[in-house]
Amino acid sequence: MHKVTSEELFQRALKVAPGGVHSPVRSFKGLDRAPVFFKKAEGAYLTSVEDKKYIDFCQSFGPLILGHLDAEVKEEVHRMVDTAWTFGATEIYSLELAEWITSTLPFMEKLRFVSSGTEAVMSALRVARAATGRTKILKFEGCYHGHVDNLLVKAGSGLAGTAASSSAGIPAEVAAHTVVAPLDDEAKLAEVFAAQGKDIAAVIIEPLPANYGLLVQRPEFLKKVAELCEKNGSLLIFDEVISGFRVGLGGMVEKTGIRPDLVTYGKIIGGGFPVGCYGGKAELMNMVAPSGDVYQAGTLSANPIGMRAGLTTLKKMQRVDGWNVLEQRTKKFTDAIKAGFVKKGVNLEISQVASLFWIHGPTASPIRSIDHIPANQGGNFKNLFLKALDKGVYLAPNAYEVGFVSLAHSDELLEQAAQIIVDAAE
């Protein structure tokens, strides 16, 4: 009996979906092979349609901090499936998660659940514009905030005076409302504010940029961002879709000591289900309908299965001291890879923050902006990725995506994976 292969499935998928996928990074574009098609996931492993097991460091790009099919989350989800799938009405499950978040994180005075990080960002920007009466949004080059039209832009020539869309189908007049500034450059940021500060409704930033490599920001730079926002009457929005509940219970708000006006969440907050959230200061969130005139709605917002999965995940992480456990495990893992690269004499390095890591080319100084990323990043990664994949390690299939470690990754498994990654390096 013929067993279907990933290549065969990809050819079928190409006939029914753009590029054969439902999110671009899954396509293995630039890797000169078809993507692996998976049929099962459990713990730290993915199993392909060819019945090959892979140690998974993608973890669905971040949501699965406990690993795939965590027993406690699975039990709660099964219970919820037998109770209700969706209400489209008020229910107790979103209330319980909202109360847990607002009582745990003092900067989240009020919040609204949505179905994705993109929706959370889109809604937060709308609140900011309504609150300030201004139209422009300042974002940073190298920070990703979902596929919101006016944030899918990159800097034009010169000092962020204009912005050009990074996607077809976005009118120039939409992109014109976005100002793009470089990361890690207080002087240029001050210049942008001096020129356009009175028009900037909000600054949105990943306080730990992790969608274009792992671009760890200096505390001084983040403080300058907050200072200029306050001075110019612009709101500060932290996009913690990746870093929220990943780097610690309080995310980068807690790590930096900076209190933004609004924060956006996704990924971990839904425990593996499609959930996003935006919230912050009560006076701002009270502007959202039906309390105020900022309209935002969603048929499946606060779906009960996602609410229970998210709450179960967060409570377990808190109970087992999950963030400290993960940070220690990940550091041991990345230290082993780092030592292996040095011993082998390969021109690769690895950066790590909490349970996030990123493999990149050598640099003379920390990579804090996209300008610091080595020019040969793509080529270095391609060979490493394909060799590691062949040996059973699944990294995110893009040179600029970070890796994620979950509680399902034991020390022994991480030691095994580290050796595979080192062996794959050249």
Swiss-Prot record:
UniProt keyword Iron, yes or no: no
Cofactor(s) named in the record: pyridoxal 5'-phosphate
Main location: cytoplasm
GO cellular-component term (any): cytoplasm
Alphabetical keyword list: Cytoplasm, Isomerase, Porphyrin biosynthesis, Pyridoxal phosphate
InterPro entries recorded: 4pyrrol_synth_GluAld_NH2Trfase, Aminotrans_3, Aminotrans_3_PPA_site, PyrdxlP-dep_Trfase, PyrdxlP-dep_Trfase_major, PyrdxlP-dep_Trfase_small
Enzyme class: isomerase
One GO term (biological process): protoporphyrinogen IX biosynthetic process
Catalysed reactions, semicolon-separated: (S)-4-amino-5-oxopentanoate = 5-aminolevulinate
GO molecular function, one term: transaminase activity
Domain of life: Bacteria
Pathways involved: Porphyrin-containing compound metabolism; protoporphyrin-IX biosynthesis; 5-aminolevulinate from L-glutamyl-tRNA(Glu): step 2/2
CDD domains recorded: OAT_like (cd00610)
PTM-bearing positions, type N6-(pyridoxal phosphate)lysine: K267
The EC number(s) this enzyme carries: 5.4.3.8
Family: Belongs to the class-III pyridoxal-phosphate-dependent aminotransferase family. HemL subfamily.
Complex formation: Homodimer.
Name under which the protein is recorded: Glutamate-1-semialdehyde 2,1-aminomutase
Species of origin: Bdellovibrio bacteriovorus (strain ATCC 15356 / DSM 50701 / NCIMB 9529 / HD100)
Organism ancestry: Bacteria, Pseudomonadati, Bdellovibrionota, Bdellovibrionia, Bdellovibrionales
Gene that produces this protein: hemL
